[in-house]
Amino acid sequence: MMKWVFALFFLLIFDVDVSAQVDPHFSQYYAYALWMNPALAGATQMDYRATLIHRNQNFGNVNTFSTSGLSAEMTTNQNINIGLNVLSQTATSGGYGYLNGALSLAYTGVKLGYNEDYNITFGMTVGFLNRRFDPSRFQLGDQYEPGVGFTPLLPSADNFNNAASTVLDAGAGIAFFDTNPLKRANFYAAFSMNHLTQPEDPFVDSQGKLRLPVRYLVNAGVSLKLGNDMVLIPHVLYARQGNAQERMAGLYLTIPYGETSELIAGGNIRFKDAIVPYAGFTFNNFTLGMSYDINPALRSSGTSTNTFEISLTFFKRKSGNYRGVRCPVF
């Protein structure tokens, strides 16, 4: 199984046409698993987990994008895991807003192999998608006075009859885990489709209605057990939404210290976009992760860009002999 992950890794490296994402995204995407795939709800070595993640993007001295996510998930004894997810993004200092909330259910009853080491989970998510903008923050052509410039008190003849929209949103996914505790390498992979309802763009006046494209996402990785209880996890992600696509590959290492603590260090590459080093630590029931996007293309052109991301996860570990594959958790 592991050879397929490395094959996909090299495919990502040599085929790197990347466009801007339609949906918001995170560099620490595994800290916010429900954003990727509802089948990942509860797919951890934990009874429950709650994560708060925040991403701040600045270009020059302008605060361009601010994105926050909150998720909570729990396992049950009925082969059903439950998750709740909320994502919010504001752009241009609050001029545009994107809010997505959803409830996820994952069925975990498919277990294959002699010892039921191969687990397949199916997930679905249903929620809402709200998009809005604030017309008062626009600078319109008829609000400019010759010799004066932009005059915000000058009324505009442009009318905005539809400044907000809330619609039904839905998605589905599937995930595979090799949970054999005797193996040195455990493989996992997942596939999801989001925005299956393809809601119309509420702000574009067009004869042919524009719709939000379905987002297809594939992620995979291998949990490699090293000596002294260290774990190395290479992982990849590919997302496509309309003509936009994102390819990421990375790895990270966990180094235990004490009984309930570990250090985390690694990095991602978002091809033709950014290099993302990150670090974190786990202490008792908390994990803190931090990352910083370095964009070589913008820096070489003299444009100042700063993208910082931080995540905080609270969890309760599973008791007993739980056989779960170690997935990236920042």
Where are these regions (language model features)?
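Subset of outer-membrane beta-barrel
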Residues: 21-330
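Sec/Tat signal peptide C-region and signal peptidase I cleavage site
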Residues: 4, 14-20
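Positively charged n-region of N-terminal signal peptides that target proteins for export
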Residues: 1-5, 111-113
